[in-house]
Amino acid sequence: MQRFYVVKEVLSDKLKRVYEFTVGNEYLEQQVDDRLREIAANVRMDGFRKGKVSLDLVRRNCGEDVVREVLSKVVDDASSQFMQEGGFGDVVTSEVRITSHPKVCSTEGKGGDLVYELQFELMPEVPSINPEEIALKEMEAEIGQEDVDKFIGELKTRYPNFVASDSPKQRAAAGDKVVIDYNSSFKGKALRGGSAKGFVAVLGGGHLPKEFEDKITGMKVGDVKEFKLGFPSDYRVRLFAGKEVEMSVKLVSIMVPKDVGDHEELAKSCGFGCAEDMVNFATESLKGRFAFMSDALMRKELFDHMETIYQGQVPESVVSQESARIRRELAPSELEAMGEDGILKEAERRVRLGMLLMKVSQDNNIAVEARDISAFVQSNYLNYGASLESVLKLLRSNQGVRDHIRGKVLEDKVVRYMVAKAKKERQNVPAGDLKSLFESI
């Protein structure tokens, strides 16, 4: 295809490219005239038969729209032809900036060429990886009686046994289970749904606002306390969010935690049929917990190996996006500890890994299917701080969310494929050592 434009290189820096295109006014006028004739041959206007509208009338009525249409098409055609002939391969981002607008089909006369810049960033070539040539350590935890006992101790803490206090002088303290009756009002008016009888909560368990718990702490059975309580604007219960509410609280009963020394008694309090069932549950839970840790360590070892394979250039625009994502994900204290250089290095590392994983997916025809997306959302929607229905709605309506989740799913699918194909060196390690290794990641 013959070129209708002149192009010159403005910038070639690493992966960045900038080219200046010039399209002559004569060519543009011809394209506009051809389009106007095409419209005139088919347009219907009052007082004219089809195809009998004068070109000047069409020019007056449609000229500006046709010029915009032609300029857009010329830019697209010139850029596409140049990119195809140049063999640039995959492009990460591209941007067009018109630097000189021509006078075409204008009442102010004709003249001037179309001049615009095409800026883009290349996707670098990354090497292929054969997962079968990678060796990974597959650690299996040696679970001992000490580990099982520790897990059962966690059950004691998680499911404490409470008994009613028989002392009239007993005051509510952190760790106690209390039963309260309460009423709430706002500006002297009772809040609908803002009262309850027999409400049960464990002090210090995070079920109540801390200020509320502080007011209850120290009360005795039968005590009534009235106080004002302020709720933050983002409080999960809309009824109270952003309000200072008058509260009246009566402490009905106090139950204190009682240590359960006998395994049979603990098993029954936790809902197991017998102590043996509880021990079996503890053992299987530990196996699952340590299998997760082992898998995470293998993934880290895989990523560390992949980092050595490609240390080449990465697209700055993608690194910039990843840096912004890191800043959104991490707490201010973590960002301060990393520093700007640390954030940049981590962003570059993530982008390189992403490029390599994408290459593996292309080489091995690994694709994301609808059922993969569905399974991911079902398992991870709580991580987005929303209900399943809300995340699904966001997935349907937000392209950015769709791309993010699709990327996470593809990464997980490719990593699982690579781990499955890699050679494994099985190692038995004490459970405590495996836990320490996992916590050091």
UniProtKB/Swiss-Prot annotation:
- Write down the superkingdom of origin: Bacteria
Provide the alphabetized UniProt keywords.
Answer: Cell cycle, Cell division, Chaperone, Cytoplasm, Isomerase, Rotamase
- Chain's role: Involved in protein export. Acts as a chaperone by maintaining the newly synthesized protein in an open conformation. Functions as a peptidyl-prolyl cis-trans isomerase.
Q: One Pfam family of this protein, by short name?
A: FKBP_C
> So what EC number does this one have?
5.2.1.8
* Gene source species: Anaplasma marginale (strain St. Maries)
UniProt note: domains: Consists of 3 domains; the N-terminus binds the ribosome, the middle domain has PPIase activity, while the C-terminus has intrinsic chaperone activity on its own.
GO-annotated cellular components: cytoplasm
Q: Where is it mostly found? A: cytoplasm
- Give the family this protein belongs to, as stated in its UniProt record: Belongs to the FKBP-type PPIase family. Tig subfamily.
Which InterPro entries is this protein grouped with? Answer: PPIase_dom_sf, PPIase_FKBP_dom, Trig_fac, Trigger_fac_C, Trigger_fac_C_sf, Trigger_fac_ribosome-bd_bac, Trigger_fac_ribosome-bd_sf, Trigger_fact/SurA_dom_sf
Please name every pair of cysteines joined by a disulfide bond in this record.
none
Reactions catalysed, semicolon-separated, are: [protein]-peptidylproline (omega=180) = [protein]-peptidylproline (omega=0)
Q: Name one GO biological process term.
A: protein transport
Keyword Mitochondrion: yes or no?
Answer: no
> Would the keyword Chaperone turn up in this protein's UniProt record?
yes
HAMAP family, from UniProt? Trigger_factor_Tig
The molecule here is called Trigger factor
